[in-house]
Amino acid sequence: MNKNLIEVKNLTFKRGERVIYDNLNLKVQQGKITAIMGPSGIGKTTLLKLIGGQLHPEQGEILFDGQDICRLSNRELYEVRKRMGMLFQSGALFTDISTFDNVAFPIREHTRLPESLIRQIVLMKLEAVGLRGAADLMPSELSGGMARRAALARAIPLDPDLIMFDEPFTGQDPISMGVIVSLIKRLNEALNLTSIVVSHDVNEILSIADYAYIIADKHVIAEG
C-alpha cells in the first residue's frame, strides 16, 4: 500500500473573519494523482498555498513526508520546497526571458550545476512536454497551450516529489486540454511524481485521477 506524502489534519484557515476551512482533513497518496474539486471561491488555490507553506493555518497540521509544514523554519521550508513544483493558473512565466531560461531558472536558483549540464536538463524537460523546438522563443511568442506546457516544464526540472496544478485546463481549447491531461498522467508515471490537481473540469480530471475530493462549505463533502 502506498504511503501518504501529504496529510492535512484538522485544518482551520480564515481570511479576516471569514472561515475558509473548518477542521478539514484529507490525504494524498505517494505516486498517485489526487483531484480536488469544488465550486469557485471555496479556497481550492488557498489549499495549495497552505500545502506549499505560503500561508499558515489558524490550527491543524499539514504533513509533507512526515514533516509539519506549519512548524518549519524558513531554511527548512526552503529545503522542502525544492521537493515541490507548482503550476499556477496564470502559468506565471517570466516575460522578459526565453522559454529556455524560464525552465532553467529554478535549476540555477537551487543548484550549482555547470551550464552544460543545465542545458541538457532543460532540453530534456522541454522534450518531455513537446517544446524542445520552442527553447529560444519568448513567452509572448507561445500560444496559450504552449505557455501552459512551458510552465509545466519549469515545475519539474529538479524532479520534485510533489507537483501541484492549479486549474491547469482553464482557457485551453479542446486539443490543448487533451494534451495537458495526457501530459499530467504521463509525467506522473514517468517521473514517479505525486500530483494534486485542482480543477472544476470534472470529466478531464476524473479521467486521470486515482482519487478525488470534493470540497464545499469549508469541508470535504465527498471523496473516493
Short names for language-model regions:
Residues 37-39:
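The feature captures the beta-strand-to-loop junction immediately N-terminal to the Walker
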Residues 163-166:
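Catalytic Walker B motif of ABC-type/P-loop ATPase nucleotide-binding domains
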Residues 67-68, 115-133:
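Conserved ABC ATPase "signature" region
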Residues 52:
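Helix-to-loop junction immediately C-terminal to a conserved catalytic motif
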Residues 138-142, 146:
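Conserved ABC ATPase signature
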Residues 159:
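Conserved catalytic motifs of ABC-family nucleotide-binding domains
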